[in-house]
Design a protein with these regions (language model features):
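Secretory targeting and sorting signals
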Residues: 1-26
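Subset-of-secretome marker
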Residues: 22-276
């Protein structure tokens, strides 16, 4: 597996966590769907997350991080650290598997990534620019239609909770000192795909139809924590299972975020080994 192939896999893993921000109307009687709608209206928040992923022969890895998103300005920033399989880390040639990311959602979703993981394929300090919709199109998915202009807002990722099914209360817990009600439920991807051709195309490609999930909702009806496990990609030849837990806090807090200057950017498509 080449360094570029590993880079592609990491990027797709990150994209997978963003794919959930699409389509569907909230079900008024479903408490989780209602909380997702309320949270999506906050526009900005800080977040922490941790995730693990198993991807076919590539093995298992995990990542965690934090960031802030500004939905009004359609931008976001994220810092994360990866725990990679030994072979992958050796091929990438670094002991610092961390990454800084900037999201620009003004036109689809553009991701800028800077990391020591890329030192073998890009000059040190440069940002890799990736057009997510363009990458997805190479995989036969119309991600440009799938993702909306507000994808850089993390509350948009909560929109998949609008397709919750069978939500039930499992208890009451404090999340970062805030009292919440804990719900367990399933996400029905067919509900998301019903009025969204692009998402229906995605589910057909990945073979994913549902996912178990949990949500912690505060007294203001906002999602403070969500946890989802997704299995996908078998139909594409690379079966993947990803579990991610995300905390949302500091709602309404905004921070100016701008893309890096063009002089520091390398386009993903220009990297060598594109056929690997």
């Amino acid at each position: 597996m080449t360094p570029r192939r590993i880079l592609s896999l990491l990027a797709l893993a990150l994209c997978a966590s963003a794919l959930v921000g699409c389509g569907g109307d909230a079900l008024a009687l479903d408490p989780v769907a209602k909380a997702a709608t309320t949270t999506a209206k906050t526009q900005a928040s800080r977040f922490d997350f941790h995730a693990s992923m198993t991807a076919g022969t590539a093995g298992s890895f995990s990542f965690h991080g934090n960031g802030i998103f500004d939905g009004k300005n359609k931008s976001g920033w994220m810092n994360m650290h990866f725990s990679l399989p030994a072979q992958a880390q050796m091929q990438l040639g670094t002991t610092d598997p961390s990454m800084e990311m900037i999201f620009d959602g003004h036109h689809g979703l553009i991701m800028y990534m800077r990391s020591p993981l890329f030192d073998r394929v890009v000059p040190t300090g440069k940002w890799v620019k990736m057009d997510v919709a363009k990458l997805a199109k190479k995989q036969g998915m119309d991600l440009g239609a799938l993702m909306n202009a507000n994808q850089a807002d993390p509350s948009q990722s909560l929109r998949m909770l609008m397709a919750s099914s069978g939500a039930r209360v499992t208890g009451a817990e404090r999340i970062r000192g805030v009292e919440t009600t804990h719900y367990a439920f399933n996400i029905d991807f067919k509900k998301l795909a019903h009025d969204n051709r692009a998402f229906r195309q995605l589910t057909d490609k990945t073979g994913s139809i549902s996912a178990p999930a949990e949500a912690w909702v505060d007294k203001q009806g906002r999602v403070r924590r969500l946890s989802v496990t997704m299995t996908m990609g078998a139909a594409l030849g690379t079966p993947m299972t990803m579990s991610i837990t995300e905390d949302l806090y500091d709602f309404g807090e905004r921070t100016p975020i701008a893309p890096p200057p063009e002089s520091l950017v390398v386009d993903f498509d220009s990297l060598s080994g594109s056929s690997s």
